[in-house]
């Protein structure tokens, strides 16, 4: 599983989000800001996106991981700030295993 | 996928005997339900619309295993009834650390873990329902049941907070608190002690399974979408 696979998983999750939030579409680009300053997601949107990513990682790659652990929320830069930062975070998390 | 898309899929924990089994049988009698049950022992229900998984929910891995199996078999869930529970009628000073662990693991941790995982599936359906089981022993602060009552008081707090956290996903979370029910759970309690509990209730009688089913049906009604974070005691 490489970074491109992870980006594609995030894009699939964004597709899910956009489907139920047609008035607040998120662009499928690596520099899209997701959560935090200028991010498109509110806290509920973040929960939905995280759940969708976790589900797609399990369905497509049989990887069962929890993205929102204590480490995620204690890092200086939020791992959920943008698509590319989130992809790096997921990649490192899977690499840890 | 084995369920029809218009079927209501109900997960009931602790279905090998007692209240859990009767709850499962009740919803199997009603049309258009698929009931998924689980317990540490083999299934005692035979019905084409019933699926049973044998596992110990107090183990974290078992919760994940159960949800993976449900995702593979039905990939849908409308209702979770957290029925599984163990009781221990013992003075705090006579409660062993092992028994305390067991009560907290089964009555609280398994409910929290299963609710977390099941909610991910339930939130995809409209009008999702989660129903927890508590007991009148909690508001009565019954002496001699400190650990059991504490675990159920925690379930009541969990019910009220998750009702708020999950309402954005269209899921309601409520709890029903029966009085004494004639099941294995209380078979070892002397009658005079049960009578002492009953004497403290407004309606001085045992709770029947029909009393419980009535509340479950009420919580599950489509019209009960605004009934959320509520604890209904029987008796």
Residue ranges and their predicted role:
Chain A
Residues 1-41, 45-48, 60-97:
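Phosphopantetheine-dependent thiolation modules in NRPS/PKS and related acyl-activating systems
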């Amino acid at each position: 599983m490489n970074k491109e696979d992870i980006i594609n998983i995030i894009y699939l999750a964004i597709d899910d989000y956009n489907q139920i939030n047609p008035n607040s579409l998120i662009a499928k680009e690596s520099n899209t800001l997701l959560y935090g300053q200028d991010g498109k997601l509110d806290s509920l949107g973040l929960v939905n996106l995280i759940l969708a990513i976790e589900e797609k990682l399990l369905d497509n790659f049989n990887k069962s991981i929890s993205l929102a652990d204590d480490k995620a929320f204690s890092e200086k830069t939020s791992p959920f700030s943008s698509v590319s930062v989130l992809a790096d975070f997921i990649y490192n998390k899977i690499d840890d295993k | 996928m084995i369920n029809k898309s218009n079927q209501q899929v109900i997960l009931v924990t602790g279905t090998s005997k007692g209240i859990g089994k009767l709850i499962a049988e009740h919803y199997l009698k009603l049309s258009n339900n698929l009931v998924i049950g689980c317990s540490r022992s083999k299934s005692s229900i035979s019905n084409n619309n019933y699926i049973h998984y044998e596992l110990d929910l107090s183990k974290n891995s078992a919760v994940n295993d159960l949800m993976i199996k449900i995702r593979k078999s039905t990939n849908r869930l409308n209702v979770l009834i957290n029925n599984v529970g163990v009781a221990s009628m013992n003075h705090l000073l006579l409660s062993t650390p092992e028994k305390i662990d067991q009560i907290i693991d089964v009555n609280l941790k398994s409910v929290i873990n299963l609710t977390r995982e099941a909610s991910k599936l339930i939130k995809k359906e409209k009008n999702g329902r989660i129903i927890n089981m508590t007991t009148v022993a909690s508001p009565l602060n019954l002496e001699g049941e400190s650990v059991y009552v504490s675990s159920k008081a925690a379930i009541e707090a969990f019910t009220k907070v998750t009702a708020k956290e999950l309402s954005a996903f269209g899921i309601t979370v409520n709890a029903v608190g029966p009085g004494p029910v004639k099941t294995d759970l209380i078979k070892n309690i002397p009658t005079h002690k049960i009578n002492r509990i009953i004497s403290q209730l407004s309606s001085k009688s045992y709770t029947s399974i029909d009393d419980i089913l009535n509340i479950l049906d009420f919580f599950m009604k489509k019209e009960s979408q605004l009934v959320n974070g509520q604890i209904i005691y029987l008796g």
